[in-house]
Design a protein with these regions (language model features):
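Cap/lid segment of the alpha/beta-hydrolase catalytic domain
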Residues: 118, 127-198, 244-245, 405-430, ...
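Conserved alpha/beta-hydrolase "acid-adjacent" motif
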Residues: 458-462
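A catalytic-pocket lid/entrance helix-loop region that shapes and gates access to the active site
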Residues: 218-220, 225-343
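Short beta-strand/loop motif that positions the catalytic acidic residue
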Residues: 449-452
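Alpha/beta-hydrolase fold nucleophile elbow
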Residues: 199-210
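Catalytic-loop region of hydrolases
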Residues: 24-120, 133-142, 279, 292-293, ...
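Glycine-rich nucleophile elbow surrounding the catalytic serine of serine-hydrolase chemistry
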Residues: 208-218
């Protein structure tokens, strides 16, 4: 048991260490490649500290403990004050034998306060299941300088728990993770800003991708009065349902997988060559929708009616044959894209789009690795009522429901909607926006930009499109006055894939909030560090990203240049 415990803990620590290292290494080394596409809004009124950095050790706010204050004048970024601390320290339920029966919980945070302050505040919503205080740089999806480098005061938090899903045993920790950490941290952060600079922030922004995108959508629904602009990337706003779909998907892949050590190894169900085969077939069917053959599907929704896996991908009997898929592979992939269902055919989540980005290594990561390592703990311990410890101790057998000993879709999927006397909020309650129509945000005049990679393998872009369609049906022409959606063709989960995943949508949001400039389109370009960009694309390729439902259409000229395309409502 000790070895198992160390292995499990190690797995989650590796995930969060990588997250921390990537945050430190992310520092905008490539944004200069296309810096002419960035705009620097200046509408908020800048400010400067009115007290010394170290005086923040004496900052006083209910339930808050300041544990460390330092000043960074290393020159790597703008000079800034770093404040670390925690809120609402308490004792709660643990997960023996991984943790003691009772453990200490607190909402850990870090704030970075630049000397050259822009007058703005940025809430950095983090990914995964949180659990670590990622440095508060304010890294922004799409590349470019961080919020800190642009003079924002930035906060980051662990959402009220440490690494690993064990916190799911504690009812309050679940709620802190879902939404309450934001509720607690926001007024404290603004008060700390007032203490340091002598005034509250003029404008406040909230941003994140993946679970961070979920945090952003939840905050836009619950706390619209606290923020002026929200920037949500690949948002898992139905995260419990998406995680259930991942487990269901693993069970589908297992039906066509080779056995390793007596169990199906789902990574053998599709090879990288199989992924490339499907990607090429999708391109063959859909590439020229926009009027030019360029290795991109610019209208992914229109593509769904044009591509048919049974017709467009050759079929073979031998699983080892090249240039074809077996009937079993086609059947499984078709089921995955149609969306998870229970035995009655009732949908558990939503469908996934056929997209050439299926070739991405990120697709394999989510389909074959995360589904058997991260999703079990998330579904079993965090989202389900009651929590199921076997999701951890049962290992792969629990994921695959081996011999009926694990996750049974019909029996266990409904647990994300359940409550009891101990867990009074269901997973689908504390993890999701309570008002998907964002009525408070719309009434206030706040702004929301959502972007989503069309090849996202975990949070279906179809779910986001369906949400925006419902929003548009509700508000009609007024929708675009406060909410915009941008689809990123070929992009995997938050970045990567055969895509132009560099873009400056965040400053478009700031311009919209502070100058009233509506973002109808922005320019996207190549990330030179993205190894999945096709070799026949120019490293200078650009494209317009169009506010949904508009799509880019070729009008003539150099197909590598965004100016050769225009956004058209189809």
């Amino acid at each position: 048991m000790k070895k198992i415990t160390m292995l499990i803990v190690g797995m989650f620590l590796v995930a969060f260490v990588v997250n921390d290292v990537s945050a430190r290494n992310w520092h905008h080394k490539n944004w200069h490649h296309k810096n002419r596409y960035y705009r620097y809004p200046t509408e908020a009124v800048p400010g400067a500290p009115v007290i010394g950095c170290m005086e923040l050790l004496d900052f006083n706010y209910p339930g808050t403990e300041i544990t460390e204050v330092t000043f960074d004048d290393s020159g790597d970024m703008l000079d800034h004050c770093i404040v670390r601390g925690s809120m609402n320290r308490r004792t709660g339920l643990g997960f023996p034998p991984i943790t003691p029966a009772e453990v200490t919980y607190a909402i850990g945070f870090e704030m970075r306060l630049p000397t050259a302050w822009s007058g703005r505040y940025f809430y950095q919503a983090n990914g995964g299941i949180d659990g670590s205080v990622v440095p508060a740089y304010g890294n922004i999806s799409g590349g470019g300088p961080s919020a800190l480098e642009m003079g924002f005061a930035v906060i980051s938090s662990d959402a009220g728990h440490g690494p690993g899903p064990w916190f799911g045993m504690d009812p309050q920790a679940r709620i802190d993770y879902g939404y309450n950490a934001v509720a607690e941290l926001t007024p404290m952060a603004k008060r700390l800003i007032k203490t340091y600079y002598g005034k509250f922030p003029d404008k406040s922004y909230f941003a994140g991708c993946s679970n961070g995108g979920r945090h952003t959508m939840v905050a836009a629904s619950r706390y619209a009065d606290e923020y002026d602009g929200f920037f949500a990337g690949d948002p898992g706003f139905n995260l419990p349902k998406a995680a259930v779909a991942q487990l269901w998907g693993a069970q589908q892949y297992a039906t066509i997988s080779a056995y390793v050590n007596g169990r199906p190894d789902i990574s053998t169900s599709f090879s990288t060559e199989d992924q490339a085969l499907v990607s090429d077939a999708i391109l063959a069917a859909c590439d020229e929708i926009d009027g030019v053959e360029d290795g991109m599907v610019s209208d992914p929704l229109a593509c769904q009616a044009l591509f048919n896996i049974n017709r467009d991908v050759p079929t073979c009997e031998d699983p080892g044959a090249e240039g074809c898929l077996t009937y079993g592979q086609k059947s499984v992939l078709a089921r995955i894209h149609a969306g998870a269902m229970n035995s009655n055919g009732d949908p558990l989540y939503t469908n996934f789009l056929w997209d050439p980005g299926i070739i991405s290594g990120n697709w394999r990561q989510w389909e074959f690795i995360a589904s058997t390592s991260l999703d079990p703990g998330a579904v079993g311990l965090i989202f389900s009522v009651p929590p199921d410890p076997n999701c951890i101790f049962g290992g792969l057998d629990w994921v695959l429901n081996w011999n009926g000993t694990g996750f049974d879709v019909d029996r266990d999927a409904p647990k994300i909607y359940a409550t009891d006397d101990t867990y009074t909020e269901a997973g689908m309650s504390f993890m999701t926006p309570p008002d998907l129509f964002m009525k408070q945000l719309q009434a206030k005049g706040g702004k929301l930009i959502v972007f989503h990679g069309t090849a996202d393998a975990v949070f279906a872009v179809a779910d986001t499109v369906n949400w925006y369609e419902a929003l548009s049906a509700h508000y009609k022409s007024q929708t675009k006055d406060f909410a915009r959606l941008f689809l990123i063709p070929g992009m995997a989960h938050c970045s990567g894939g055969p895509a132009l995943d560099q873009f400056d949508l965040f400053n478009a949001l700031v311009d919209w909030v502070e100058r009233g400039i509506k973002p109808d389109s922005v320019t996207a370009w190549v990330n030179p560090d993205n190894s999945e960009v096709p070799s026949d694309w120019s490293q200078d390729r650009t494209r317009p990203l169009c506010a949904y439902p508009a799509v880019p259409v070729y009008k003539g000229g150099d197909k590598e240049d965004a100016s050769s395309f225009e956004c058209i409502y189809q």
